[in-house]
Amino acid sequence: MQERTPPARDDGCTRTALFRRAAAGGAVVAGGALLGARRGNGTSLAAPTADTDAKILNFFLLLEQLQEAFYREALRRTRPAGALGEFARTVVRQESEHVAFLTERLGSRARARPKPDFGDALSTPEQFRAAAIDLEETTIAAYIGQGANLTRDAIGAVGTLLSVEARQAAWVLDLAGKSPAPNAADPAQGSGDIVAHLRRQGYIT
């Protein structure tokens, strides 16, 4: 199937825009998905606190750091062309903003960058595309799975990131000739399942 690039649009993903939208309690739909995660497979804690926020946001930071490294290395190693290349160039910029946003929010609590190993996932454009789908969908499941454990302030901030992750997933699914929105509701996964999956993929140890 011929790869298609979605219509040009303002991605609204500068750090200033992210903070403005977070402060306004933006991403209502994504925030609703996070609040509704208690009905999914995520682990729901009794009462969200600032400490649990820091732990969960660091988990999300790990995922965003992995994605940024993945797309940056893909541009260097795989060198995707055409619409797939445009996707990779756009998403690496967005993931870089996500990393900066979470790092600034966490301050001194922010985790160090991991040293991922993407192995054969970047051997060919086709393998890169398949791995990108998996990584985007894994990140979305993680956000939904931990959403109910965040304070409302953190949900408002994280919702602005989740909505962008969903658009990224839809974009790369479309490039692969698949439905960009195959389900009425996305599944949730707990952090333990997410980390185990990333280890099986060989991305982290």
Which residues fall in each region the model found?
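All-alpha RGS (Regulator of G-protein Signaling) helical domain and cognate RGS-like helical scaffolds
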Residues: 2-14, 23-205
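Hydrophobic/basic alpha-helical segments enriched in Actinobacteria
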Residues: 18-19
